[in-house]
């Protein structure tokens, strides 16, 4: 997937589409979660599309939000992007985009399914 100008994408992080280009997940509206980055890509000095990132679909572990934690009531429900490594239970009044579906929650974090 072509990377957005100025983007830094970290291996294992949530990748979103914004304006047709890949960038790191963050709390914002109108982002489309694409999956997990399989590599680190630095396009901080590049233009739109200068770099490409491989994105994988599947079920991956992310940190649980300290401020808006995902609990067992969220199983099989949408969870929301707080940053590229953290998900939350709610969209914070419309301030966050969906990450994917909560597959499981345990002491290590939240298992998010990207389809």
Write out the residue ranges for each language-model feature.
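Surface-exposed, low-hydrophobicity beta-strand/loop segments enriched in small/polar/acidic residues
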Residues: 1-115
């Amino acid at each position: 997937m072509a990377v957005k100008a100025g983007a830094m994408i970290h291996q294992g992080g949530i990748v979103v589409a914004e304006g047709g280009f890949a960038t790191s997940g963050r709390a914002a509206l109108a982002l489309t979660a694409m999956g997990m980055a399989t590599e680190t890509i630095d396009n901080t000095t590049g233009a739109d599309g200068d770099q490409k990132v491989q994105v994988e679909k599947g079920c991956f572990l992310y940190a649980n939000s300290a401020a808006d934690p995902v609990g067992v009531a969220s199983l099989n429900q949408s969870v929301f992007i707080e940053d590229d490594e953290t998900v939350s239970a709610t969209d914070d009044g419309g301030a966050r985009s969906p990450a994917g579906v909560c597959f499981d929650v345990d002491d290590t974090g939240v298992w998010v399914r990207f389809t």
